[in-house]
């Protein structure tokens, strides 16, 4: 190989290594998340055993061009005095994932979706009665304006307390 060709190959290699990689058209969006935890009282129980559920929700959002994506992951550590796999702990449980337009004041919801599959998972337990678990929602998406965020709300309807769904708000994701 001639000296000129070697120099050209070396120059191309140096430029290729120094140049930043072009973003891929199919690159996955980078999610920004916020996590918060609440101790939630089982209002249908007033006996002697501890009945609070520690529930943590991580809410995540990402942007790709004009589209915002959001999902939530919920983790729980529930009261273990109930019978194994007791289907009467709650009458309903759902996690609502929202995409909001970030503005001064109240952020308006541009899209939301409820994921009701949580009730059966909360009532499931190990053979020793431990009620711990994790559930990640599917991702929702929506074309949103310049600044948006993901938010989530847990709705619990304890069996037999007569109060219906009680709302538990969690920390929204950082803006994207």
Place the predicted regions along the sequence by residue.
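Secretory targeting and sorting signals
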Residues: 1-27
